[in-house]
Each structure stands twice: as structure tokens, then as C-alpha cells.
Amino acid sequence: MLIPSKLSRPVRLEHTVVRERLLAKLSGANNYRLVLITSPAGYGKTTLISQWAAGKNDLGWFSLDEGDNQQERFASYLIAAIQQATGNHCAASEAMVQKRQYASLSSLFAQLFIELADWQRPLYLVIDDYHLINNPVIHDAMRFFLRHQPENMTLVVLSRNLPQLGIANLRVRDQLLEIGSQQLAFTHQEAKQFFDCRLTSPIEADDSSRLCDDVAGWATALQLIALSARQNNSSAQHSARRFAGINASHLSDYLVDEVLDNVDARTRNFLLKSSLLRSMNDALIVRVTGEENGQMQLEEIERQGLFLQRMDDSGEWFRYHPLFGSFLRQRCQWELAVELPEIHRAAAESWMAQGFPSEAIHHALAAGDAKMLRDILLNHAWGMFNHSELGLLEQSLAALPWSNLLENPRLILLQAWLMQSQHRYSEVNTLLARAEQEMSVEMDTAMHGDFNALRAQVAINDGDQDEAERLSMVALEELPLANYYSRIVATSVHGEVLHCKGKLTKSLAVMQQTEQMARRHDVWHYALWSIIQQSEILFAQGFLQAAWESQEKAFQLVREQHLEQLPMHEFLLRIRSQLLWAWARLDEAEACARQGMDVLSTYQPQQQLQCLALMVQCSLARGDLDNARSHLNRLENLLGNGHYHSDWVSNADKVRVIYWQMTGDKTAAANWLRQTPKPEFANNHFLQSQWRNIARAQILLGDFEPAEMVLEELNENARSLRLMSDLNRNLLLLNQLYWQSGRKSEAQKALLEALTLANRTGFINHFVIEGEAMAQQLRQLIQLNTLPELEQHRAQRILRDINQHHRHKFAHFDEGFVERLLNHPEVPELIRTSPLTQREWQVLGLIYSGYSNEQIAGELDVAATTIKTHIRNLYQKLGVAHRQDAVQHAQQLLKMMGYGV
């Protein structure tokens, strides 16, 4: 719940001097990205901007306090201010910030700017007291904000110091409007206006000018002179003499002498107690000060000119001028030290009564009242946890004695979930075990269930499937239906364990149940997680169209609940990319991988490993080895600088091994094979993938026998567990093993089964990636004309993609290759004495790639008759009569040059 006063522009007070010269300068504010008002306290920054803002409708105002250093709180108020300015134009951003479904402040702002793209009118956002921000993450985000905000938007920042917002760059580009303390200082004319409306007796212009010069135009000093003159019934000149030599550092003494000591005891007590409130209204004042009719008291303080500011048009909310408020709080600690805890307790109770638990916690912490803090947390902590107010929760729990936590197991559970959310898995079990051992109260069965559900989540995160399964089942037996969150967690873990153990049908049913429960209780991140798991299971079963439809449902949920910036969104984009890659929709697959990397752009670079592996995979499918190598360099750097789950390493290793296969890098494959772990089982698609990597490396090294043993066992497991996508992949690798070891009949049998299975999976690129060896076999099958219609169509599509992307043979016949070939000692004498032209070498490469005459003509953009002439000439020079002879001749030349064909 947001405090309304923090979003209200200050009310324009009576008897204030209208700063015409500065307002004239600000009239062109919409031409700048940033308007920066900087000066020490008391120079009239807020008053000036409130005068300028009067009458502007498309303007949001955000008044900061120390608590806004929490990123989530800062984001909530900033988006609320924008919504105020735009009439709720940015609904998606508001939903994201309310549910804390954004990856970072920068990514939230990026979403905000997308929504503001169709906002046509000038838009202003005022942030007051920016000097209170000391969180570097917020500074970074606001620099991003300034770089990317719409052209029709102006940010207005008020600060006592120069904020860390990349101001120099804006200044150079003439995108910064600055007003500093020298410009804010009152002129002689403004000082005269000020005294004329504040003093009962007029003051001469010369005297006014001299007073202005004495205090260097400092508005607070002029206000204090006028206040002192009124309170003491003395002249302004007399007050000024007493003020001579006073500056901000000595102001405290002056305020004691000239303000506090000149009000009655009741008012003094009111000022000191109320200063502990960062903002105040009638109810808060009555509870904290004990005075009746708090609103009337506030208005009286305002009338006396005691530095009280209205914060909204209704006049309900007030706050002290920052300079005066800081002074009063210091005096309160001196003069009311004994009463201080009780005052803070009263403030906390009043904030709670108005529904602001975060503000109440601030005062409970200040009071040092562990019992009150405990009670607030017991009633409101889980709501705060669900709204990601994690920093304040952590601070609050740390302030509670361990004995208090032991008496309240739900708070221990909360602390454990905080650790889990920060990936401090080992600490979770340590905390829960210690609590159970030392707890004086008897935990009921439901609480045991809550503990076990969390332990199950930690166990599955840690890869301990058996313990995760045991704990999740125990939790589900212990938990009543009312403990829906823990039941969702335990059910999800149970489904994930079944998935890992290859029990796909059961896992699918459990994940569907998890989705229903999560949707029923609006636990959207678990709903999304369960749909993603369903898609993975369907993919593993070979039902890729059904997996696609699950993903569509997940994308719809992401849009509806504004989950675009959750890291889990990257997981969804990644599995969509994998599916698109399988179907040879490479541009779309690469776009999804890039989107996934964008979602994680504000996290550690290591988090992008899986999407980066997909980028490599797309390049490999295109036959673009240079680009693949470029991505691989980054991928291998990330692998060497992080600790990853075995599944992540397996996916990264997959593209590395394929790259080594394509480039014939046996040394790299051998080194990797010596070091890579060999899993004990292969009962899920994660482990199947790692064993397939091993088999591929063994085939590259010519170790056919151990590779065959691996693949036969993989296929046995895949058939029994119905891992049909893995079976499809395994058959293709087995085909390559048979082909390279000269077992052509067995190779054809494996390929035919793989083609049939692809009718279900839709696989294209898993064939394409095998390159020329696959192309040769498909050409033979197509020429035999014995394939069923679907398989024939797929074979033609695969061959077309291989010819399009895998031009090793075509690329090999470039000028550099031909020059090396002609200088090779074993080159046939016929080629040396009667060399082909460069165009004829190109035609030979395309013939070898399986192109027809018409396709070659289209590729080289020449007439078909010209191609026939080139073919006739190269046949004559090579001494061959038929197309197949030319293909065999090209193959022999490539082998002679060391290319694995």
C-alpha cells in the first residue's frame, strides 16, 4: 500500500514569492531530458518546482524518503507517479510492479517506455529529495531511464547534491537544464517581496537588500529572520544581527534559540514528537502526540510558519521541511530520550491501523520492540514476501532474538524461504534443522508439512531426486488443503522428480495438477513453471506439436500476468527456440534465443549459457562455422568461469562436440572425453543427452565399438521409457556410426526408422546437422524411390537444407582451395595438365552437393545452356562420362585434401 502523500505535489502556500525569473527559465523544460535543481537545504527547490508544476496535468510527483533505497519500493512509487501523470496509461508496468514480476529496475523501465511510446503529449516526472538515494542499483537504473526515456518526457530531479546520473554527457548534448543555489538565491527584489508579505510593519528596500546580502539570498535564513521578528516583536534588522554569521552547520543552535525556545511547552512537545513521522495526517498526530484534533494542530503549526508543508491538495497529509525535520528529530533524541520508544510504538500502531505495515516496521525497529515487530511480521510478513519486500523482511528478522523465532515457527519458515529465494540452499536445511532441534513449542503436523515442502524444493534444486521425492510425499500427507502454497510446492517437486526419473506420463499428470492448483490460488510463477514442465515432457515423448501448444498457453499466461521479466520467461523462450530449431525454423529459433538472453541481461552473464548454446546450434545448422566459433569462444569462457548444473553443461557440451565433428578436431574431442563425467543412468532426456555427447565424440575418434554400446543402451532405455525424441536423435547418431564403419545396410535401417519417427517429432535439423554423410544417404534413398510419401517429402526437405547450409564441398572449391589442390603432390596428372576454370570448379562443387542443372543455373545466375557447356567441359577435363562419376571424383579430391566426407 502506497502512502498518498509521497505522490502528491506540495500545495502552493500563501505568502510565497513567485519566482518569475526562474519560472521563465523553466518554461522551456519540455525541450530537455533532465531538469536538475541542486542546492543545499532551504533554498526553495521544492517551492519553485511546485509553482512551475501548478496547472500541469501530465505530471507525476514522487517525494523520496530514506526507505526508498529499497529497489521494490522505489519502483512502486515511480510507476505510481507515472500512472498519476498519464491517467493510468501504463497498466502493464503497474501490474508488473505490483506483483514484483520484473527482472530489474532497468527492465521494468524498458517495459514502461514501450507503453509510453504511444503517449503523444509532453510528460513530466518530478523526483524530490534525490540526495536520499544511496543505492548504486537505483543510480544505474536511473541512468538507464535517462538514456532511454521518450523524447516527449522530461525528468525533473531535486537534490541537495549532484546526483550520479551521467550528467556530464547530458550537458554536452544540451539535454540538461540546470538551476543551482546561486540562481535559487533570492534577489534584492524577491527579498523585498518576501518581507512585505511576512512582516507586519514594512521594511525599507535598502534594509531588505542588506539583509538579503547578509545571508547570500538563502531563503531559509530570510524565513527565520521573519519568524524571529514576529515571535520577539522585534525588527527584522535586529533579528538579522542575531543571525549574522550563522550558516547551515550552526543552524541547530540558532533554531533552538530562535524557534524552539520561543514557542510554548505544548507546541515544543508537539513539534518534537511529530518530527519522528516521515509524513503525517490527523490520525497519526493524535496517536503520536496525544493531542486532540491533530488536523487543527497541524494547521496551526503551518500558520505559525514553522516549516510545515502540505503534501496534497486535500490538506490531509503534511511533512516538515527536511532541514527543520532533521533538526527536530535530533532534538527529540536529546530531550525525549526516555519517551522515544513509546513514541515510536505509538507511531507503529497508528501506521498499522491505517494499513501501512512497512512504515510500522520502521518504527518498531526504531523502538527496539521485538514483541511488536514479531506481531507485525506474523500478520503481514507473508504478504510482504509475496510483494518481494525482501530487504526489509531480512532486516526485521535479523532484529528479532532467536528465542522469538523459535516460539514462532512460521517466522523461521519465512526466513528459510528468504534464503531459498536467494539460492542459499545449504543454509535452508541448516536453519530448519537447528530450529527443530531447539524449538520449545511443539510444531503441528501442518507446520511440519510446510517445512518438508520447502526442504523438498531445496533437495530437487540440489539434484537429490530421492530425498526430494521422499520429502514431497511426506509433505503432501501432512499438509491440509488450506496450506495451498506449500501443497503447490510439494506437488510441483513430486512432478519434477517423476520427470527426472523418466516416468513421463505420471509426471505430465502431476504437472497438470500443479498448474490447476497454482491458477486457482493465483500463484502465477508456479503455474508458469508447471506449463513449461508439461511442454518439456511432451517434447521428450516426441509430441512436439502438443509441446508447441503448451508453450502457446505459457506465453499467453506471461502476457496476461505480465511475467515477461521473470527469469522463468527465459526458460520458456529457450524451449521454444529448441523446438523451432528442431523444425528448421532457424531465424525464429535464433530470435527466441536472443530474447531469452535479453530477459537475463541484468543477471550474471553465466545465466545466459543455455541461450548462447542455442545461438551456436543455429550457426552450426546453417553451416556457419565462423559464427559458431565466435559464439563458442564466449560460451567456453562462461563455462570456465562458473559452476553449473549438469544439464546446463551437457547442453553446452553438445554444441562443442558437434563443432569438433564438423571441423574434424579430434584433439579437442579426446581431451574432453577424458575429463567429462559419465552418468550412472540414462533414464531421462538430460542424461540421454550427455551420453549422446560421449558417443558422438567416440565416433569422431573412430572408437566405434564403445560408441555402439552406449547408443544401444540409450535406445533400450529410450524405448522402454518412451523417450521418443531421444530415440530419434540416437538413431541418427547410430546411423552415422554404421555409415562411417562401413555397415551400409545397418545405416540405412537406422535412417529409415529415424525418418519414420520424424513423422511424429517433426525433426529436420537433427538430420541436417549430420551434413554430407546424411546427404549422400538421402540421395540414394530418394533415387530408389521406395520411401513412403511423408518420408520422401521429409528426405527432400532435409537434403535441400543440407545443400543450402552445408556447403563444405562448395566452399572447398574456392580459389584458395584450388591453388592448394594443384600444388598437392598426389593431384591427378590430368587435372594438373588440363586445369578447370574457376567457374568449372564451382559447377563441380554444386554437382557434388546434389544440385540439378536448373538449380546450378539459378545458383550461379546464368543460363541453363551455359551450365551444360561448363559441365561438358569439366567432364572432358576430368575424363568422366556421367554425373555420378564426377561426384566420386570430387569426393576423392576432398579426401586427398584431408576433408572427412
Swiss-Prot record:
InterPro entries: P-loop_NTPase, Sig_transdc_resp-reg_C-effctor, TPR-like_helical_dom_sf, TPR_MalT, Tscrpt_reg_HTH_MalT, Tscrpt_reg_LuxR_C, WH-like_DNA-bd_sf. Keywords: Activator, ATP-binding, Carbohydrate metabolism, DNA-binding, Nucleotide-binding, Transcription, Transcription regulation. ATP binds at S39, P40, A41, G42, Y43, G44, K45, T46. Residues 853-872 bind DNA. Activated by ATP and maltotriose, which are both required for DNA binding. One of its GO terms (molecular function) is DNA-binding transcription factor activity. One of its GO terms (biological process) is positive regulation of carbohydrate metabolic process. PROSITE patterns: HTH_LUXR_1, HTH_LUXR_2. Residues 829-894 form the HTH luxR-type domain. Belongs to the MalT family. Positively regulates the transcription of the maltose regulon whose gene products are responsible for uptake and catabolism of malto-oligosaccharides. Specifically binds to the promoter region of its target genes, recognizing a short DNA motif called the MalT box. Monomer in solution. Oligomerizes to an active state in the presence of the positive effectors ATP and maltotriose. This is HTH-type transcriptional regulator MalT. It comes from Klebsiella pneumoniae subsp. pneumoniae (strain ATCC 700721 / MGH 78578).
